[in-house]
Amino acid sequence: MNTIRNSICLTIITMVLCGFLFPLAITLIGQIFFYQQANGSLITYDNRIVGSKLIGQHWTDTRYFHGRPSAVDYNMNPEKLYKNGVSSGGSNESNGNTELIARVKHHVKFGNSNVTIDAATSSGSGLDPHITVENALKQAPRIADARHISTSRVTDLIQHRMQRGVLTNDYVNVLELNIALDKMKY
């Protein structure tokens, strides 16, 4: 009988610690010390939320930098999510998979071998908000032409927004870069 009582007490203590006190402590720490990150790292522009630093978006306008391809087509629409059931994830296809090869060829624009790997392949999450600096620099002439500004102004903006990778290539956040483009004076 003593063993059962001890087991029940230990179970209740564990449930209170792990189910209430620990989550409460972590939530409080997040809200006090990491408020921006704990609430989605949302980016505001012109007094409205335009996205998150953590989630990529699909860009098609030639005046903007384009992010990485998404294996889930940046599926953040609740109605699409209900139909498709997938909101993030990689393709999980092998290098020899014909669908993957066709998709990479499509992103490479029919045989242009002068493209960075992140411009042709999706990330593991399918929602990567960053591109490499090399990818951004290759897009700079297109953006400069579309905005009627010099390529050097666009490359200066890229260099200013560059984040250093520790074990990876240097990268830039596409949404922040595109907002900075819109804020530029022509």
Curated annotation (Swiss-Prot):
Membrane topology type: Single-pass membrane protein
Keyword Transport carried by entry: yes
A matching Pfam family: KdpC
GO CC, one annotated term: plasma membrane
One Gene Ontology molecular-function label: P-type potassium transmembrane transporter activity
Domain of life: Bacteria
Subcellular location: Cell membrane
Segments traversing the membrane: 10-30
Known partners and oligomeric status: The system is composed of three essential subunits: KdpA, KdpB and KdpC.
Role description: Part of the high-affinity ATP-driven potassium transport (or Kdp) system, which catalyzes the hydrolysis of ATP coupled with the electrogenic transport of potassium into the cytoplasm. This subunit acts as a catalytic chaperone that increases the ATP-binding affinity of the ATP-hydrolyzing subunit KdpB by the formation of a transient KdpB/KdpC/ATP ternary complex.
PANTHER family: POTASSIUM-TRANSPORTING ATPASE C CHAIN, POTASSIUM-TRANSPORTING ATPASE KDPC SUBUNIT
Family: Belongs to the KdpC family.
Protein name: Potassium-transporting ATPase KdpC subunit
Organism: Staphylococcus aureus (strain bovine RF122 / ET3-1)
Gene this chain is encoded by: kdpC
